């Protein structure tokens, strides 16, 4: 009786049942684009008599209220289906309804039509079924259910309790026979209201008796929407999600097949792959070329740097990530194009050809999510870079980024740890930026009595700030086109001359020099001049606006921004009113802000510096960081008043 009672409680909600009260969602999550009213899923492993094999059946049912036009996309669904050789996943039982509340109080129902169900080929191993509910508008409720069947027991669907819209009720049931063992992991910050485990009848019978099974029920209620904010890695690192990994499978009284791997197995599998390990041994392609790239009297560092720059110049990144090569090193060199693996495995081969010990580091990019560090698997990884060690200093190199300095990984790669896979072993290496993202502004000029400011503005960039600016410049057809765009988009002041230095050398600071004329920089107030002492670089928006943040702030690198302003005042002018000088820091000195205004021999000197001395802030540090930026914004909105001295 206990089993029956529990099973009845853990059940799907009725399809097609709707009431007028369901449309009244004004007070629930008032700022949401849409609301999941109910959501139910079940993953069940069954024995299929016709095929004589176990299959994984996944049932999904949801009901969503569309609050406004921004939520209309939630009436469109994409269901991925995996295929391999003759085996493939299938979908059936697709049924959908759109409900609209009419003015007379009646509820209109529009059934999903077959023409709104399309299957597209995504790749050789994956299709996508796209479902679009019809006649959806603001205030609609949509309902959808379907079932997928998979012969791939390792592909048990993850259950995403949290999404970008709130959910009132989300329920998932897994029903797994004892012959299958899964590692189950709940990640994110969603608290489950119910989690209980019960025995259930698998209906799988062997010559030795029935196979027992375990039913686990997971329920969460009133789940808030996940809110994306600046400075974070992939949201899927932090959304409340239930994941399953097949650990082992066994035939009753037969052998057990283990699916959980080891890092040694992962290394051996990669080194044995034609599009990975084979491409690491392409040293012969570079033996004849290297004498034109490096010289015998070079230091190992200089040789590595020269080879790094050579590969960057020979193979252009095609904007595709890859743990495995698309074209292979030889073809990438011939076509002068390739994905990240084509480029970086070529780099490793070239370094090895120069007798520099180079090995691959596999990693997961920031947008791909955090890999499971204690679960050896290839599927979590989508990228490879090169590792070398010179004079006891380790360097990670990515030659796919044409504007990255030697040893500084692109921001996309800064995602906690990567795995260094040598032929003799493996180890974890930190993925971190060696350089602070730095921008410095320096202005020297003269203020006229009519409020016009004229002078020279220098901006100097390093780290990711320089990389981003170089990418922006090279996205234009020419340097002159870039300058023209800057000229057109600069509305506060006129640029009379614009020079750029060190554009082609990422190892140097990128410098831009502009001769500017800023009319109405200062407002005339009686005989005084009143102005905010910023030409550019002013902080106007706080990147942190949540009341609390459950996931870390990840900046990618330390940040540094400074501004030095030297303005010669009109004759006999002096400071009459100015903001107070500021020297503030967080308690652990992880962030600091200086704002100093002074006058010397008729020249106004403004010095501003903001430093963020670590790349990651934990959730309990969030409010302090938010307040820190609020003080910066407040200080940079205050005026300085200068006028003729009364002496």
Predicted features, each with a name:
Residues 6-10:
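Sec/Tat signal peptide C-region and signal peptidase I cleavage site
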Residues 1-4:
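Bacterial N-terminal signal peptides
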Residues 11-647:
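A sensor for short, sequence-defined functional sites
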